[in-house]
Curated annotation (Swiss-Prot):
Gene name as annotated: efg1
Role summary: Involved in rRNA processing.
Domain of life: Eukaryota
Protein name per its UniProtKB record: rRNA-processing protein efg1
Family: Belongs to the EFG1 family.
Length: 311
């Protein structure tokens, strides 16, 4: 006969002395916390929200979106006059901000692009100026004839003037324009000598001037020379100075305009000649195809006619 298990015979209902059962009416015990009411709460780690960095410059996409929204609003016919005036002013402000931001980005990109080239040119030009100044002091203190000393000092002063213009060229060249280097690295031969290396008094070792004479200098070099006399180098560097005549004589700008005009004309003539050649070849191929098909049809027709008459 099976044993009769009942609730009264369970070990929970009849606890023994060996096992202690917790009363469920008590608060649960926790090992990591103090259950007393007066105990201070433990400091838990809270997620620290880092505030977003506010960019000092506006977003280009945001400005473009605002411009589109304002233009869409201005296209409405039922827009009141006062609201239209406000939106037109806002549109002008947004467009101005967008233009300034694009110019700032272009400026920073050009600075980053030509930073290293300008640094090398400035370093070489500084060494040239210091070397020539030291040479000038040595010649002035030397025991030479008055005539020979005067000739050497005059030649050194001319070289020193050019070297100072070169240095200012590397420093005050407009930051928003493409930089044209003044110095180039000298290639070394297998025996260690350099090809076409100039005198040590003129250029730094390992570098030489790309443009030997004043006439061969870039157009901006003459602008820098002029700004040195006028005292407007800072304006030139920041691009706030209008430089319509690139050369001191004004030939540079006219020449560049003429070159651009001639280049555009040559491009137009080339494109026209290409189009005409393409048309001629197209017509020729069409004519050839027609002649071939007509010849084939004539041959087929002769054969068929001959066969018909033979019959």
């Amino acid at each position: 006969m099976p044993r009769d298990y009942s609730r009264s015979q369970s070990p929970v209902s009849n606890p023994t002395g060996d096992r202690n059962y917790r009363d469920r009416s008590d608060r649960p015990k926790r090992k990591d916390r103090d259950v007393s009411e007066d105990a201070p709460h433990h400091a838990y780690r809270k997620k620290i929200k880092i505030p977003k960095k506010e960019h000092p410059y506006p977003s280009v996409n945001e400005l473009k979106k605002r411009i589109r929204d304002v233009k869409r609003l201005l296209n409405r016919v039922d827009l009141p006059a006062d609201a239209r005036i406000v939106q037109e002013r806002a549109l002008a402000g947004y467009e101005n901000d967008l233009e300034e931001e694009m110019q700032r980005r272009h400026r920073s990109a050009m600075i980053k692009k030509y930073h290293f080239v300008r640094f090398l040119d400035r370093k070489t030009a500084t060494k040239d100026v210091k070397r020539l100044e030291r040479r000038e002091q040595e010649v002035s203190k030397s025991d030479l004839d008055a005539v020979a000393k005067e000739k050497k000092l005059a030649a050194l002063s001319q070289k020193l003037d050019i070297a100072r213009v070169n240095l200012n060229y590397t420093i005050y060249y407009p930051l928003t324009e493409k930089y044209i280097a003044l110095y180039a690295a000298v290639k070394k031969n297998k025996d260690g000598t350099t090809d076409g290396a100039a005198d040590d008094s003129d250029v730094d070792a390992g570098y030489k001037l790309v443009h030997a004479t004043r006439e061969e200098k870039p157009a901006m070099w003459h602008v820098v020379e002029k700004c040195m006399k006028d005292g407007t180098l800072e304006l030139l560097r920041e691009g706030k100075l209008d430089t319509p005549d690139v050369d001191s004589t004004g030939k540079g700008s006219q020449k560049s305009k003429i070159d651009k005009h001639a280049q555009s004309k040559t491009d137009q003539t080339k494109s026209k000649s290409k189009k005409s050649e393409y048309k001629d070849t197209k017509h020729a191929t069409k004519g050839k195809g027609r002649s071939v098909t007509s010849a084939a049809s004539d041959e087929n027709g002769d054969e068929s006619d001959g066969g018909f008459f033979e019959m």
